[in-house]
Design a protein with these regions (language model features):
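N-terminal/domain-start alpha-helical segments
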Residues: 1-123
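Short, Lys/Arg-enriched segments at the junction into DNA-binding effector domains
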Residues: 116-144
């Protein structure tokens, strides 16, 4: 089961979104502030995908995204926010986001976008693994 970290401060949205994502077989953990998200992200490898709101009480999802990208270029990041201004969309994508979805949104579309990003992430991991190791022996799978 894929694990998602959701950074969102709107409690009513959190409840419905967590319920729906779990029904779609995603494991979801929630952070309500940037500070709380930083604690979760100290173990970034636990997550397969991040969903970030932009406007939070103690910072922005853009800042979280930029911090994550310094450590991990591969993890898919989706911005899910009410801010539909072009400047916000551009900043989200330029800061390292893979997708930008505005509220209100369709849950089916969000789940499809999540699955698409997770498929690409798995493929990218496979591409990255070009050698095998067993003890002292390393095999170059590409023969280069």
């Amino acid at each position: 089961m894929n694990r998602i970290l959701l950074l969102e401060d709107d409690v009513s949205l959190i409840d419905g979104l967590v319920y729906s994502l779990k029904k779609n077989e995603f494991d979801v953990e929630v952070a309500r502030t940037v500070c709380e998200a930083k604690q979760y992200l100290s173990e970034l490898d636990r997550y397969d995908l991040l969903i970030l709101d932009v406007t939070l009480p103690d910072g922005t999802g853009f800042d979280v995204c930029e911090r994550v990208r310094k450590e991990n270029q591969q993890i898919p990041i989706i911005f899910l926010t009410a801010s539909d201004e072009e400047v916000s969309i551009i900043r989200g994508l330029d800061s390292g986001g893979d997708d930008y979805i505005t509220k209100p949104f369709k849950l089916g579309e969000l789940c499809s976008r999540i699955r698409a990003l997770l498929r690409r992430a798995v493929y990218a991991k496979r591409e990255k693994n070009t050698s095998m190791e067993c003890g002292d022996i390393t095999i170059d799978l590409l023969g280069s």
